[in-house]
């Protein structure tokens, strides 16, 4: 589906002038067309495993396991309340659609908190200035890799492009510790987001599914039975036949 109807809520909240400026904030002058937009949520899959991303987003393969079900339940709780909630100097928007034509991504933020700040932006129907603070909900504990941080940073970069304001920080909420982990959106993290999204678009244009590279992470992947990484460790039949012919000669 197109992003225009999805983004109408944020358009009404922030006003047409600022919203239209997003086209001029795209990194390196690159602007993707709407039909070229990829799912923002796929960035986390891609950073974790290129093959997992391709199986899901190119080949439309998906299997549930305990981890994916727990993750879906956690996200449903984050999206369960009213889409807009006010708590003093804190305005919370849930399931907020976002887009970046510079990154070529569209998707949803679990929660975006708008905090009263002189560095913020004006919001229609609200007094003062408000600084966005994205919060992404994840199952389990903080991970050794940066896939979650990259997804959150991409959300912030979408919001920056749409609202024309800098967003220095956000947070990941993990289900097991039940607390937030602050994430600083450094230049290094932002550049990694740009590099990965560019690679995603290259894979998508080529329709390319990488070969499996077995690792410890494969055991927890819901797609392991579809991906079959264990086959990579086995010797191809052609190798056996070639060796047998050599032995007979």
Model feature map: region roles:
Residues 7-10, 22, 45, 214-217, ...:
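Secretory pathway export signals and precursors
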Residues 49, 209-248:
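Cysteine-cluster motifs in flexible loop/terminal segments that predominantly coordinate metals
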Residues 33-36, 199-215:
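Short, intrinsically disordered, charge-biased short linear motifs at domain edges
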Residues 78-81, 175-186, 244-249:
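Short, mixed-charge aromatic SLiMs
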Residues 46, 57, 77, 192, ...:
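Residues that form generic nucleotide/phosphate-binding pockets
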Residues 1-13:
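Extreme N-terminal basic, low-complexity initiation segments
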Residues 10-134, 234, 246-249:
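Metal-dependent nuclease catalytic cores that hydrolyze phosphodiester bonds in DNA/RNA
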Residues 107, 113-207, 219-225:
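Nucleic-acid nuclease catalytic cores
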């Amino acid at each position: 589906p197109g992003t225009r109807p999805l983004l109408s809520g944020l358009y009404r909240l922030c006003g047409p002038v600022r919203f239209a400026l997003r086209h001029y904030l795209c990194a390196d002058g690159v602007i993707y067309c709407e039909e070229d937009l990829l799912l923002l949520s796929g960035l986390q899959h891609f950073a974790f495993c290129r093959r997992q991303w391709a199986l899901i987003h190119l080949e439309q393969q998906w299997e549930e396991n305990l981890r994916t079900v727990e993750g879906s339940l956690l996200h449903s709780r984050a999206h369960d309340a009213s889409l807009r909630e006010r708590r003093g100097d804190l305005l919370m928007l849930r399931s907020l659609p976002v887009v970046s034509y510079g990154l070529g991504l569209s998707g949803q933020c679990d929660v975006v908190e708008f905090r009263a700040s002189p560095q913020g932006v004006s919001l229609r129907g609200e007094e003062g200035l408000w600084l966005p603070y994205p919060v992404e909900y994840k199952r389990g504990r903080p991970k050794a890799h940066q896939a979650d941080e990259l997804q959150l940073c991409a959300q912030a970069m979408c919001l920056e492009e749409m609202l024309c304001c800098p967003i220095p920080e956000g947070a990941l909420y993990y289900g097991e510790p039940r607390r937030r982990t602050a994430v600083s959106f450094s230049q290094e993290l932002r550049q990694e987001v740009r590099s990965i999204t560019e690679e995603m678009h290259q894979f998508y244009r080529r329709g390319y599914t990488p070969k499996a590279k077995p690792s410890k992470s494969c055991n927890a992947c819901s797609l392991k039975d579809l991906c079959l990484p264990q086959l990579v460790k086995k010797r191809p039949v052609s190798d056996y036949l070639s060796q047998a012919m050599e032995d007979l000669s």
